[in-house]
Structure formats: structure tokens, C-alpha cells
Amino acid sequence: MLGWGMDMSKSVMLCCLLSVQPCYAGYVFVSPKLGVYGEALGGPDTVGKAVKQADGTKIAPKIWYYAPRTPLFGVDIGYQADNGLLFRVNLDAALTRLMFRSQCVVGYSLRFGWGGGYVSIASGIECSATVDDAQYEPYTKNEQGTTVASNTVFPCTVLEALVRDPALTADYLLYGMQSCYAIPLHVGVSYYLAKRWGIECALTASLGISMRTDVRVPYAVRIGPVFRV
């Protein structure tokens, strides 16, 4: 009788545990997202977007510049386990300039509360490619009458400060095509409002280098629906 009672208590405990566990031990998900992207840049050529004079010489002081906040559209695909492995790949494209960005990260996913909430942290590799050419942007005149391109990367105040030097009287051009390789830190929060769909917010900050800069720090905030497949 004692053995039967112990077996019965174990069965009851197992049923209780199963009743509060999620239906999905692991699942594949797809999440289209909208977001915003920016970056801090530093280096002698500032990622190929140096100010260039008509004679071909460049002026790019070794100063940090913060790129505009670029709107993004993209999609995430991955695998997420309850209190376990997270694997995700995403591809983003800029909506206001020619830029593509992709990440592949691996990490850990933690389920919280009694609902469908998840917090995840992951890292991996990030690659991006950007083309910026100010000839497609409006031009303005500074105090000396020098033509200055409205920024795609530099704040206008930075360009104006550079061309206010009386020795700099030539036209300037923002140009460049560059790729960046970085190590991202990804933090995501998702909540499933129903059995197969919910909402997710992801924050990413990366540290990387490119062909023409010393340091590059891209960052992005993205949000969108998430669907279990």
C-alpha cells in the first residue's frame, strides 16, 4: 500500500507540473519587424564617408560621428526553446538609403511568469553593407558660398564646421561604400497573446570594424509581431 501511495503521489505531482508547463518546449518562429538604426563611427576615413575636396584630398578628423536614425524593415527567423536554446537569423533593409544588415546569433531564452512572456539574450556575428553618396542629396550653401551636401551620415553642423575654415574653399562630397563586421549583443522581449502569435521587441548593440574605420558601433531597436510556425 505504501508503494502504491508513493506512486500515486508522484503521478499527481507530474500531472500538476505538466498542467503549468507551456505547450511548446521548443518552436520555430517568424517575426517581421520595423525599427530604427544608428551608429557611432570613428576613424581617419570615417567609414569611407570622408569629406572630399575637388582636388581629391580628404578631410576627416578622427572624431566620433553619430549617424542619423535610419528606419528599417526586416524579418527574423529562428528557433526558441522554453528556458533553453535560442537561435535566430535576421535580415534588415533601410527604408531611406541603400543599406542591408544581417545577424546570426545564438543564446538563451528564459520564460517568465505564467503567461507567454520570454526574455532572451544572444550574441554572434553581424554583417552590414551601406552605400552613401551625397550627389543624390540636396545641396546647400555655407557662409563662404561653398556647396555642401545635406547629410546622409554627418550632421549638417559637422559639415559646416569643416567648411568654415577659410583655407577650405573647394566643394565637398560625401561618398563611400563600406561593409562592417561586428559582434552584436542581442536582447529581446516577446509576449504571446495567443497560442501562435504575439509581439516582440529587440534591442541590439554591436562593436565592429569596417574596411575604412577604426571603430564602428551600430545599434538598432526593432519591434513587430511574432508567429510560431
Swiss-Prot record:
Superkingdom of this protein's organism: Bacteria
Pfam families membership: DUF2715
Protein name (Swiss-Prot/TrEMBL): Uncharacterized protein TP_0127
Family: To T.pallidum TP_0315, TP_0618 and TP_0619.
